[in-house]
């Protein structure tokens, strides 16, 4: 699923694993539950809701750091998107991005956040090329956790065959404006749509390479597995 604002309900469960944190022995695995739900608003526009709820396990970032599991902060994005592509075939959407302080067990700073998000892409002859981006500022608990100002950039290229096999490459780069640090994983994935109980499901697997990360951040290679349940509208 290369088009994150298609008029299709999708519910991905995306597992990720990275290591090399802290002194080199730290690990983190997490499942992103990220439903995408479109709503029609009149004859010409859609409102796309995209939620990301991380369930995280992490540990061994430093000596005596026990493994712990908890929730991360929820990121909620809304895209206002025209139902029809532009004359040049571009599909686009823009809207607000919100962060809810749902983190538990010291998984992440428990802060409210707000900002803006947007996506633009073009699909032709099986290819999808585009960019998703957002910027979120902290708006709460800054006395406890400090200020936060982060930009997320996700350029992506994908190809889907006539047999519904997909190949993709993207980065999920994040720039921390306060710390002045980049995190840049490069992801390579392969997916296949199958039928389970007569319903379409996409299975995806892949690897990532950390081209850049802050001190104490993930290093070298990571892995990704995903199951996406698809619910065509109508």
What do these predicted ranges mean?
Residues 1-234:
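Transmembrane beta-barrel domains of Gram-negative outer membranes and organellar outer membranes
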């Amino acid at each position: 699923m290369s088009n994150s604002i298609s008029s299709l309900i999708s519910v991905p469960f995306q597992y990720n694993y990275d290591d090399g944190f802290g002194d080199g022995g730290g690990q983190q695995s997490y499942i992103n539950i990220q439903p995408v739900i479109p709503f029609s608003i009149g004859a010409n526009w859609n409102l796309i809701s995209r939620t990301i709820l991380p369930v995280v396990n992490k540990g061994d970032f430093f000596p005596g750091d026990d493994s712990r599991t908890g929730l991360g902060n929820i990121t909620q994005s809304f895209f206002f998107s025209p139902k029809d592509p532009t004359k040049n075939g571009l599909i686009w959407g823009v809207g607000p991005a919100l962060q809810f302080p749902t983190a538990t067990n010291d998984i992440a700073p428990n802060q409210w956040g707000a900002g803006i998000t947007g996506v633009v892409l073009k699909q032709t002859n099986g290819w999808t090329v585009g960019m998703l981006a957002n910027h979120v500022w902290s708006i709460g608990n800054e006395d406890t956790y400090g200020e936060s100002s982060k930009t997320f950039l996700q350029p992506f290229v994908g190809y889907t065959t006539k047999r519904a096999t997909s190949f993709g490459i993207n980065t999920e780069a994040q720039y921390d404006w306060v710390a002045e640090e980049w995190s840049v994983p490069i992801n390579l994935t392969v997916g296949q749509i199958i039928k389970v109980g007569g319903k379409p499901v996409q299975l995806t697997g892949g690897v990532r390479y950390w081209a850049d990360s802050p001190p104490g951040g993930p290093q070298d290679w990571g892995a990704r597995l995903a199951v996406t349940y698809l619910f065509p509208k109508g």
